[in-house]
Amino acid sequence: MNKEDLKILRKEMGMLFQGSALFDSMTVLENVMFPLDMFSKASTKERQMRAEFCLDRVNLSEAGHLYPSEISGGMMKRAAIARAIALNPKYLFCDEPNSGLDPKTSLVIDDLIHDITIEFNMTTVINTHDMNSVMNIGDNIVFIKEGVKEWQGTKEDIITSDNQALNDFIFASDLFRKVKKMEVEELKEGHKL
């Protein structure tokens, strides 16, 4: 693969890093403009308009002038999502998108990733240990243990899976084990959940 091919490939991929990876010395708007400045041939005005559109899409239109140190963790994640979609990528890769966030903010981020995936017609790949995110966002789920694909299926399949490694991971807490037992019993009785 030559440099031009790599450049094309990079334009097609949006990246959402675990720690947001915003540049501290740049405003939120400048952070979102960064991939546009690197890879877009559009005018400065067009790049700024696209960045403002992306910030508006993640409900941060009023935060463009602020620096990462001046915004919350949830706002930083949303700014990172705006940056990840700035080039209108075909693929969005997310590494632990909810790390360090409270449960309520995590749901906001999950919903945003889900909605943007559909709206921008992207394929989104999420690496996470957060089963709430898996159940909120995932359509096709792959469980990897020690670098090996252990299981693949839908979120509906998780509940009834007999894969021991998957069950050990997901149902490690008493609460989740009880929920699974109740749901499996209801499914056996013919009730739809």
Where on the chain are the PLM-derived regions?
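C-terminal boundary and immediately downstream tail of ABC-type ATPase nucleotide-binding domains
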Residues: 156-193
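A short, proline-enriched helix->beta-strand linker immediately N-terminal to the Walker B motif
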Residues: 86-90
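Helix N-cap at the start of a conserved alpha-helix in ABC-type nucleotide-binding domains
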Residues: 103-105
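Short coil-to-helix segment of the ABC ATPase nucleotide-binding domain corresponding to the Q-loop/switch region
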Residues: 26-34
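Conserved ABC ATPase signature
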Residues: 67-71, 75
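Catalytic Walker B motif of ABC-type/P-loop ATPase nucleotide-binding domains
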Residues: 92-95
